[in-house]
Protein backbone atom coordinates (compact mmCIF):
# COMPACT_ATOMS: atom_id res chain seq x y z
CA UNK A 1 0.00 0.00 0.00
CA UNK A 2 1.34 3.42 -0.92
CA UNK A 3 1.34 6.20 1.61
CA UNK A 4 -1.03 9.09 1.05
CA UNK A 5 1.03 11.33 3.31
CA UNK A 6 1.95 14.71 1.84
CA UNK A 7 5.17 14.77 3.86
CA UNK A 8 8.29 14.92 1.72
CA UNK A 9 11.00 12.38 2.44
CA UNK A 10 14.38 14.07 2.23
CA UNK A 11 17.67 12.22 1.97
CA UNK A 12 19.93 13.11 4.88
CA UNK A 13 23.11 11.73 3.31
CA UNK A 14 24.39 9.24 0.78
CA UNK A 15 27.55 7.23 1.42
CA UNK A 16 30.11 6.21 -1.18
CA UNK A 17 33.20 4.08 -0.75
CA UNK A 18 36.59 5.57 -1.53
CA UNK A 19 40.22 4.43 -1.56
CA UNK A 20 41.83 7.60 -0.20
CA UNK A 21 39.70 9.41 2.37
CA UNK A 22 41.80 12.60 2.34
CA UNK A 23 41.71 12.87 -1.46
CA UNK A 24 37.94 12.25 -1.45
CA UNK A 25 37.31 14.88 1.23
CA UNK A 26 39.24 17.45 -0.80
CA UNK A 27 37.46 16.52 -4.06
CA UNK A 28 33.93 16.84 -2.62
CA UNK A 29 34.65 19.88 -0.43
CA UNK A 30 36.16 21.70 -3.43
CA UNK A 31 33.46 20.53 -5.84
CA UNK A 32 30.57 21.77 -3.70
CA UNK A 33 32.32 24.59 -1.82
CA UNK A 34 31.40 22.63 1.30
CA UNK A 35 33.12 21.56 4.50
CA UNK A 36 33.56 18.38 6.47
CA UNK A 37 30.73 18.35 9.02
CA UNK A 38 31.63 15.05 10.72
CA UNK A 39 34.99 13.27 10.55
CA UNK A 40 35.60 9.97 12.34
CA UNK A 41 38.72 8.88 10.50
CA UNK A 42 37.49 6.31 7.99
CA UNK A 43 34.24 8.25 7.33
CA UNK A 44 33.62 11.93 6.67
CA UNK A 45 30.31 13.69 6.05
CA UNK A 46 30.55 16.70 3.75
CA UNK A 47 28.00 19.44 3.24
CA UNK A 48 26.98 23.02 3.87
CA UNK A 49 25.71 22.20 7.38
CA UNK A 50 24.98 19.13 9.49
CA UNK A 51 21.22 19.72 9.19
CA UNK A 52 21.22 19.72 5.36
CA UNK A 53 21.73 16.81 2.93
CA UNK A 54 25.33 15.60 2.82
CA UNK A 55 27.61 13.20 0.98
CA UNK A 56 29.54 10.77 3.16
CA UNK A 57 32.83 9.32 1.94
CA UNK A 58 34.31 6.31 3.66
CA UNK A 59 36.77 3.49 3.41
CA UNK A 60 34.72 0.28 3.64
CA UNK A 61 34.16 -1.04 7.16
CA UNK A 62 35.11 -4.59 6.15
CA UNK A 63 38.56 -3.44 5.00
CA UNK A 64 38.01 -4.57 1.42
CA UNK A 65 38.57 -2.28 -1.54
CA UNK A 66 35.61 -0.03 -2.37
CA UNK A 67 33.56 -0.99 -5.42
CA UNK A 68 31.29 1.25 -7.44
CA UNK A 69 27.74 -0.06 -7.59
CA UNK A 70 26.53 -1.28 -10.97
CA UNK A 71 23.72 1.15 -11.76
CA UNK A 72 24.39 3.25 -8.66
CA UNK A 73 24.63 7.01 -9.08
CA UNK A 74 24.30 10.03 -6.80
CA UNK A 75 22.51 12.94 -8.49
CA UNK A 76 22.71 16.56 -7.38
CA UNK A 77 20.07 19.09 -8.36
CA UNK A 78 21.30 22.40 -9.75
CA UNK A 79 19.53 25.75 -10.06
CA UNK A 80 20.12 26.26 -13.80
CA UNK A 81 21.55 24.71 -16.96
CA UNK A 82 24.54 27.04 -16.58
CA UNK A 83 25.14 25.63 -13.09
CA UNK A 84 24.99 22.07 -14.52
CA UNK A 85 27.65 23.07 -17.06
CA UNK A 86 29.80 24.81 -14.45
CA UNK A 87 29.64 21.94 -11.95
CA UNK A 88 30.49 19.40 -14.68
CA UNK A 89 33.51 21.50 -15.72
CA UNK A 90 34.59 21.98 -12.11
CA UNK A 91 34.39 18.23 -11.43
CA UNK A 92 36.57 17.54 -14.48
CA UNK A 93 39.09 20.14 -13.33
CA UNK A 94 39.26 18.38 -9.95
CA UNK A 95 40.12 15.02 -11.52
CA UNK A 96 36.74 13.50 -12.38
CA UNK A 97 36.25 11.73 -15.72
CA UNK A 98 33.51 12.62 -18.18
CA UNK A 99 30.55 10.25 -18.41
CA UNK A 100 28.26 12.53 -20.40
CA UNK A 101 28.58 16.17 -21.38
CA UNK A 102 25.91 18.63 -20.27
CA UNK A 103 22.84 18.41 -22.44
CA UNK A 104 19.12 17.92 -22.76
CA UNK A 105 18.37 14.25 -22.02
CA UNK A 106 14.59 14.34 -22.17
CA UNK A 107 13.11 17.15 -24.26
CA UNK A 108 11.77 19.95 -22.04
CA UNK A 109 12.02 17.67 -18.98
CA UNK A 110 15.59 16.81 -17.94
CA UNK A 111 18.95 18.52 -18.54
CA UNK A 112 21.97 16.79 -17.06
CA UNK A 113 25.67 15.97 -17.07
CA UNK A 114 27.58 12.98 -15.72
CA UNK A 115 31.05 12.35 -14.28
CA UNK A 116 32.90 9.74 -12.27
CA UNK A 117 34.80 10.91 -9.22
CA UNK A 118 38.46 9.87 -8.79
CA UNK A 119 37.29 6.57 -7.22
CA UNK A 120 34.92 5.80 -10.11
CA UNK A 121 31.63 6.68 -8.37
CA UNK A 122 29.10 8.04 -10.88
CA UNK A 123 27.69 11.51 -10.23
CA UNK A 124 24.98 13.44 -12.06
CA UNK A 125 24.27 17.16 -12.02
CA UNK A 126 20.79 18.00 -13.28
CA UNK A 127 17.83 20.34 -13.50
CA UNK A 128 14.31 19.57 -14.60
CA UNK A 129 13.16 21.65 -17.50
PLM features per residue range, with description:
Residues 35-69, 123-127:
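Conserved short beta-strand elements that form part of the metal-binding/catalytic scaffold
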Residues 22-31, 113, 122:
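Conserved active-site alpha-helix within GNAT-family acetyltransferase domains
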Residues 1-25, 52, 74-76, 129:
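N-terminal beta-strand motif that seeds the catalytic metal site of vicinal oxygen chelate
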Residues 58, 75-77, 101-102, 126:
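A cross-family glycoside hydrolase active-site/sugar-binding cleft signature
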Residues 24, 28, 84, 91:
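Hydrophobic pocket/interface hotspot
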Residues 30-37, 96-97:
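Conserved acetyl-CoA-binding loop of GNAT-fold acetyltransferases
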Residues 1-7, 11-19, 49, 65-129:
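Vicinal oxygen chelate
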Amino acid sequence: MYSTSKEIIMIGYSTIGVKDIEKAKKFYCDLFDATVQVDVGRLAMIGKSADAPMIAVCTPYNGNAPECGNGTMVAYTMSSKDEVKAKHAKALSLGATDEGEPGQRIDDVFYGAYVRDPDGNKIAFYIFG
